[in-house]
A protein has these predicted regions:
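Short beta-strand/loop segments at the ligand-binding rim of alpha/beta enzyme cores
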Residues: 98, 165, 263-266, 345-355
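Bacterial N-terminal signal peptides that target proteins for export
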Residues: 1-8
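Preference for extracellular/luminal or secreted protein segments
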Residues: 22-35, 39-43, 48, 80, ...
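C-terminal motif of bacterial Sec signal peptides marking the signal peptidase cleavage site
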Residues: 17-21
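Phosphate/pyrophosphate-binding betaalpha-module
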Residues: 251-268, 294, 298-311
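Enzymes and membrane/adaptor proteins characterized by extended Gly/Ser/Thr/Asp/Glu-rich
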Residues: 110-114, 125-248, 270, 275-289, ...
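Alpha-helical scaffolding segments of alpha/beta enzyme cores, especially the outer helices
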Residues: 90, 151-158, 207-210, 246-258, ...
Length: 433
């Protein structure tokens, strides 16, 4: 019943509403208002998602800076060890400039104060201390007997702090100072042995050297390296080893070996070749008319061979090689330095021919000395006035015309040769075989 009542109560309002509508059909049925749409709630803006804060990148830990490796300290460059001075340098250091210049001069004994041609007297002994010459040249006028000559050469050397050269001009035959006075060796001029070959040339060189040493000489102005290529030549002729350039070259080289075996220094002469001339340089100017190229192919062959065999000195002839220089060869830088030293490679001592010869009559001793040394000469043979020659060289050094280095070069060559001289003499006195 209860359920029925509830149902009736619910239907009554519906009935009433239906009746009212049927009784007033014309009445405007008021518009049933559209039910107001429940306004949609304003959309709540979706909040932008709060961006996750970008995490600050965890900074890479700053690496500790790798310490720069401590550089190894740059070692100071090891200085090149200062070379020990050579024996000749030690000798040179003890010499004043003037004493060095005297080493570049060869005297005749008569040039000394109170000069005596046969024995050293007291005045000469004192003068040797004031003028310590590089050497002495003895000629036939200094030779009277074997005992006298031995004493003379011994006493000339005895007063010298640096042993002097004791030189002779001993070729055999035409130029035979010892053989024509006190010696026992009688050789003919070398040309006569040319067809007996190199062994004979070597033997003759050794024989000459041994006789020279017997009388106190330590250097010879031989062998002759000129070639007798001009039949009209009057000054060389039979003194030459040959009239053929190649043969002369072989014989001269063998002779150099012979001189050394006998214990004596030797000298090639007369550079650049006196065998194709006609005049005699003892009396005046002598001209060589060959070109330099012709000299290389001819006259220079024996000089080249002798140098390669170890010759100690080369003598510059009083010759004018007009294709190269209008002055005598000893004043020619082109001949002495460029040709002889640089082209032929000669490292020994360059010596002049005797400065008293007629070919140099128009030059003073001072001029000759300075011009020759500037050209490359080391040793002045027998100037007429040795004191004037040394004075001129000293003045040229003080004025800067000659450098002290240039003088030093020559003196070192001379001292080196003297040390070699001692070695040769020792070897000859005590042959290994």
């Amino acid at each position: 019943m209860k359920l029925l009542r509830i149902l009736i109560l619910l239907l009554i309002p519906v009935f009433l509403l239906t009746t009212a509508a049927c009784g007033n059909e014309t009445a405007e049925t008021p518009p049933i208002p559209e039910p107001s749409a429940t306004p949609a709630p304003a959309p709540v803006p979706t909040p932008e998602p709060t961006p996750e804060p970008t995490p600050e990148p965890t900074p890479e830990p700053t690496p500790e800076p790798t310490p720069e490796p401590t550089p190894e300290p740059t070692p100071e460059p090891t200085p090149e060890p200062t070379p020990e001075p050579t024996p000749e340098e030690l000798l040179l250091e003890g010499l004043s400039l003037r004493e060095q210049l005297w080493q570049m001069v060869v005297l005749r004994p008569a040039n000394l104060q109170g000069g005596n041609n046969l024995a050293v007297n007291e005045a000469m002994g004192e003068d040797l201390l004031a003028r310590p010459a590089g050497g002495f040249y003895l000629d036939a006028e200094n030779m009277r007997s074997a005992d006298q000559l031995r004493a003379f050469t011994r006493d000339l050397a005895a007063g010298m702090a640096i042993p002097p050269l004791i030189l002779c001009d001993e070729e055999g035959g035409v130029v035979d100072r010892l053989g024509n006075t006190v010696g026992s060796l009688k050789l003919r001029s070398m040309y006569h042995y040319k067809d007996q070959g190199e062994d004979k040339a070597r033997e003759n060189g050794e024989l000459l050297a041994r006789e020279l040493r017997e009388f106190g000489f330590n250097a010879d102005l031989a062998p002759v390296a000129d070639v007798w290529s001009n039949p009209a030549n009057t000054v060389i002729r039979y003194r030459a080893y040959s009239d053929d350039f190649s043969q002369a070259a072989r014989l001269v080289a063998a002779a150099v070996e012979g001189f050394h075996s006998g214990g004596v220094l030797c000298t090639l002469k007369h550079f650049p070749g006196h065998g194709d001339t006609q005049a005699d340089s003892h009396y005046g100017a002598v001209y060589v008319t060959r070109s330099l190229e012709e000299l290389r192919e001819r006259e220079l062959l024996p000089f080249r061979a002798g140098i390669e065999a170890g010759a100690d000195m080369v003598m510059i002839g009083h010759l004018i090689v007009s294709s190269v220089d209008e002055e005598p060869a000893l004043f020619s830088y082109a001949l002495v330095t460029e040709l002889l030293r640089e082209e032929l490679g000669f490292q020994g001592v360059v010596i002049t021919d005797a400065l008293q010869m007629g070919a140099l009559g128009s030059y003073t001793d001072g001029e000759t000395a300075v011009k020759a040394v500037l050209a490359g000469v080391d040793l002045l043979l027998c100037p007429r006035d040795p004191e004037a020659a040394v004075d001129a060289l000293e003045a040229a050094a003080e004025e800067g015309i000659l450098t002290e280095e240039r003088i030093r070069e020559s003196v070192l060559r001379i001292l080196r040769m003297k040390l070699e001289m001692a070695r040769l003499q020792e070897a000859a006195a005590c042959p290994s075989d």
